[in-house]
C-alpha cells in the first residue's frame, strides 16, 4: 500500500514522463537507446494510457502527448521513431499544429455563433488572394538602385521625425 506522499510523487513523475512523450526528439532518443524493444517498457506505455481519462488529462499542459502515447502503442511507429528523419517529420507536424490549427481553433472559439461561416468564406478569399499575389510576383522584376541613392535614403531614414504630429 502506497502512502499519500508516494502516490503524489508517482503521479508527478508519470505526468512529467507522459508530457515528455510530446517531444519527438525524446522519442527518437528512447528508440535509439532500444527502450521501445524492451517488453517491460512497452507494457509501461500501455499502462500509461490511463492518462487519456479526462480526470487525468486535464492535468497535462501538452495534450499532444496523448496522441504520441497512443501512436507509441504501434510497433511500426516505435520503429520509425528510431530514424532521425522520421522524428524530424513528426516534429515539423507538431510545429505546424501549433502555428496554424490551434490559432484557427482559438479564433473560432472566440467568435459568436453564426460567424463561423463568414470566417470560412473569408479564409477561402484569403487563399485565393494569396494565389493571385504569388502569380503577380512571378512577373515582378527587381531593379536595384545605385549605391548613392541607397545611402541618401538611409540618411533620410536616420533623420529625426517631427514628433509634434504624433501628439495630436
Swiss-Prot record:
<dbReference type="Pfam" id="PF05669">
    <property type="entry name" value="Med31"/>
</dbReference>
<dbReference type="GO" id="GO:0003712">
    <property type="term" value="F:transcription coregulator activity"/>
</dbReference>
<protein>
    <recommendedName>
        <fullName>Mediator of RNA polymerase II transcription subunit 31</fullName>
    </recommendedName>
</protein>
<feature type="compositionally biased region" description="Acidic residues">
    <location>
        <begin position="113"/>
        <end position="159"/>
    </location>
</feature>
<dbReference type="GO" id="GO:0016592">
    <property type="term" value="C:mediator complex"/>
</dbReference>
<feature type="region of interest" description="Disordered">
    <location>
        <begin position="113"/>
        <end position="168"/>
    </location>
</feature>
<keyword id="KW-0539">Nucleus</keyword>
<keyword id="KW-0010">Activator</keyword>
<dbReference type="GO" id="GO:0006357">
    <property type="term" value="P:regulation of transcription by RNA polymerase II"/>
</dbReference>
<dbReference type="GO" id="GO:0070847">
    <property type="term" value="C:core mediator complex"/>
</dbReference>
<comment type="subunit">
    <text>Component of the Mediator complex.</text>
</comment>
<keyword id="KW-0805">Transcription regulation</keyword>
<comment type="function">
    <text>Component of the Mediator complex, a coactivator involved in the regulated transcription of nearly all RNA polymerase II-dependent genes. Mediator functions as a bridge to convey information from gene-specific regulatory proteins to the basal RNA polymerase II transcription machinery. Mediator is recruited to promoters by direct interactions with regulatory proteins and serves as a scaffold for the assembly of a functional preinitiation complex with RNA polymerase II and the general transcription factors.</text>
</comment>
<keyword id="KW-0804">Transcription</keyword>
<dbReference type="InterPro" id="IPR038089">
    <property type="entry name" value="Med31_sf"/>
</dbReference>
<comment type="similarity">
    <text>Belongs to the Mediator complex subunit 31 family.</text>
</comment>
<dbReference type="InterPro" id="IPR008831">
    <property type="entry name" value="Mediator_Med31"/>
</dbReference>
